[in-house]
Amino acid sequence: MSAESTCRRCDGPTAIKTRQANFCQPCFITFIQQKQRKAMEGCKVLFARPGCVLPPAINILVPISFGQSSLALLDMAHAQLEEQAKTYENAAGFTLNAVFIDCSEADPLEKEPNQIISELEKRFAHAKFTCIPLSKAFEGASSVTLKHNRDYTSFVSGISEEPTSVQQLLSCIGTKSAREDIISVLQRHLIIEEAKKQNESLPTTVAWGHNATRLAELTLSLTIKGRGNRIHAQVLEHKNPKDSISGLPEIHPLNDVLSYEIPFYNSFRNVSDLAVDTVSKPSQVTKNLSIDQLMHQYFENIQTNFPSIASTVVRTAAKLDDPNAAKQGLTPCLICASPVDPNQSLAWLTNITVNEPAAPETEEEEELSKKAHMEKSQEKTGDADRHLPVPNLCYGCIITIRDTDSFTFPKRASKQDILDEFTL
């Protein structure tokens, strides 16, 4: 057998070639798992004294989507627990909780979530599983209705103690990108809320299953959607809870693993059959793809021949500081809860936008100009609107709801709390 077809570590038969090196199955599994172990190096079995094992001092919460990447992270963390139990007579350095946000009401899966979780429980006996419906974000929440104008101004047209629903929320969102953006905001909210709940009994770290390619996709999609200020919070690791916007440690154990390597790992570990896709598939027509789908397609097409691109994007993102670190008087965005300076987003948007058209040169342009002027006059904010509360929105959320005339969103607060957050 030639050197070119043998594993670089043990000279066994090559199962995969990646990063300009050959690996057999066992060596590749070890290679990938070592990256996860390094990120979770604090999850070791602790001893009070020789022979006296302490209970787990940390809880690892893994958000799962039933996709390949989060499934791989779950398998790696579970394998670490199995090794600890075998080595230290059933001792464990951490507890493992997998949390799934059920978005099937908005985007159905090929299998029922309960059926999938039942299969995962059989495969990963040392992990606990929690399924949270997306609708929980609306439970016990007031609903705020925003009137949104084409000049990007928004006003609170109604506040109700009655909660809205997933379908009501999504029905007023016109574009696929905006729908995915709002759903991701709700998913993250529910995951962090569950992590904070578990943190009350045991210090909890959120271990996201994003691989390097997915983090690169997330970096660019956040930038395109006007959420560049979220890159520091969602792409970077925050092992110190003081550095995290959620107040909890957040890590990315797979941030040095490429997405095309994940299916090989799952196949070698015999867990590929546990991955489940959504019923809806991405369109074959580029213009019908959402921003997230476009970014995914872009990196999937280039990473095999240019694997360094994704890691370069992630390393560049890691150099970004928190844009709000030195700012005072920030309040949370009504929709995504990002810290934002009241009215700054709209002011910045107005300043960078060309608000007046060029002078018409032909009769046709003159007619179109008059028509546009009439439409703009009809859409101008009336005196009644000017007396309505102004919601505190970040630039990204203003862009997300720009094509929506009326938007109803859940708000976990009383009417007075909501009014106190608005500028009158």
Swiss-Prot record:
UniProt keyword annotations, A-Z: Cytoplasm, tRNA processing
Gene Ontology molecular function terms on file: nucleotidyltransferase activity; sulfurtransferase activity; tRNA binding
InterPro entries reported in the protein's UniProt record: CTU2 (IPR019407), Ig-like_dom (IPR007110), Rossmann-like_a/b/a_fold (IPR014729)
KW Acetylation (keyword) present: no
Main location: cytoplasm
Keyword Transmembrane helix belongs to the record: no
Subcellular location as annotated: Cytoplasm
Listed GO CC annotations: cytosol
GO biological process: protein urmylation; tRNA thio-modification; tRNA wobble position uridine thiolation; tRNA wobble uridine modification
Pathway the protein contributes to: tRNA modification; 5-methoxycarbonylmethyl-2-thiouridine-tRNA biosynthesis
Location of the region described as Disordered in the Swiss-Prot/TrEMBL record: 357-385
Basic and acidic residues: compositionally biased ranges: 368-385
Listed Pfam families: CTU2 (PF10288)
Taxonomy, superkingdom: Eukaryota
Family membership: Belongs to the CTU2/NCS2 family.
Listed PANTHER family: CYTOPLASMIC TRNA 2-THIOLATION PROTEIN 2
HAMAP family recorded: CTU2
Summary of the function given for this chain in its UniProt record: Plays a central role in 2-thiolation of mcm(5)S(2)U at tRNA wobble positions of tRNA(Lys), tRNA(Glu) and tRNA(Gln). May act by forming a heterodimer with NCS6 that ligates sulfur from thiocarboxylated URM1 onto the uridine of tRNAs at wobble position. Prior mcm(5) tRNA modification by the elongator complex is required for 2-thiolation. May also be involved in protein urmylation.
Protein name: Cytoplasmic tRNA 2-thiolation protein 2
Organism: Yarrowia lipolytica (strain CLIB 122 / E 150) (Yeast)
Gene name of this polypeptide: NCS2
